[in-house]
Amino acid sequence: MNMDGAFWRAIVLTIPVTLASCTDNRNDTKCSDFYTSRLDAHGFDHLEGGITRHKSSGLTFTRCAVGQRLINFKCAGSAVKLNWDDAQSYVREIAEKSGERWRVPTRIEMLEIFEGECINPAVNPYVFPNMEVANFWTSSQRMSPDAFRCSVYSYQGSVYCRQSRKVEQPFLMVRD
């Protein structure tokens, strides 16, 4: 048997397995099709002022990205997009001026709002209406190098901790 032929045959047989392992194995159902009722908040209690409490964690999240407002069950306006350092400062300033303990959520806290059964974005659209499909900042830092921070991709709720901290992205706020 020719070794070159065996080598290339092994490569060709390995490629489909490798490519299949890179896919998202969840159901490709859009969350807007998966959730059919505004009445069932699916683990969240809606509060006044465009915020919602996650029942199992007790965390309170803004329902819209910073810069948007909840009007008639939809997020209106444009999300503020800042680099990581400016996003942290922006939320600290809101906390100081409002007297509320708002902060940018950690990557673990952000994962609390994402759903495993659906995508595009992977959130309940009745809890987080018309959320932009984008990377959202978290407050989580990468060990090294210092140039990177963690974000969560809203399309499928995946964490990415090699995001340049200089990239401007939307973000939510959370409080305990």
Predicted regions and their residues:
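Bacterial N-terminal signal peptides
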Residues: 10-18
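Bacterial N-terminal signal peptides that target proteins for export
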Residues: 1-11
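Glycine-aromatic-enriched surface loops/turns that form tight recognition elements
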Residues: 4, 19-103, 107-176
